[in-house]
Amino acid sequence: MFGKLNADNCELFPLVLSSCDKCSDLWQPFFMLLKKYWPQMDERIYLCTETKRCHFDGLDICSPLNMPAGSTWSENLIKLLQYVKEDYLVFMLDDFWLKAPVNIQLLERCQQIMRTNADVGFICLVPQLEPSVENPLSEEFPGLIEYGRQTPYRVTTQAGLWRKDYLQRILLSHESAWWFEMFGSKRSRRMPWRSFVVQTPVFRYDDGGVLYRGCYVSEYAKWFAENEGIELTPGRRMGSKRTLQQEQTEMGLLQKLHPRYVYEYVRSHI
């Protein structure tokens, strides 16, 4: 089904930045750090947010959406991908605030792997797991680990390279980002594309991003305020990651009792 592609006919890798209008306060810090730690970035940036627009000097930011209130994370991304002309993309979330220079050499190598191997659908650009029998070191692509078919979270919203048509195939319009990772990983088992993850990070940012369920992670956010001069949003709640995770665990137990949860759960398995 798949074969080698001619690298001379390849498309570029624009950045798709997944966000939402209520997180617009994250954009200026994100782009400031992007310019600082990835100054070579000169490709288009597609900002996936419901209605708002953003400008940052020196960056080509496109915000094409005008989504209705209540649209889901996946609905927004599905719609945005219709505007992306390129066949490949770099995907990031708005709270992945960079803390160190991007590993350009490794990024370009991963891009070349995807360009020239049509069965490579996703390469996660931050380490996620250690090599194992289920997730072996790739002999074909040294420095990469190949996700096993049964590995949980072989589809993730961590920073990564995507083949656009693969991403479009996995997305279901009713899902949140968290459900996309959970159930998209299961759907991906039935698809022919392979997924990989780097052993050495291309991007360096705090684990999971500077937010947790919409709240600043205090140990992360304060670092940026002190070391990068980032002005944090006064109205955005802040808490330790441990506290925020515990609250989410307790809330999640209640959510699973709601009929809507059961309905959406079934939809993700169809």
Protein language model annotation of sequence segments:
Residues 154-219:
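Catalytic core and acceptor-binding pocket of nucleotide-sugar-dependent glycosyltransferases
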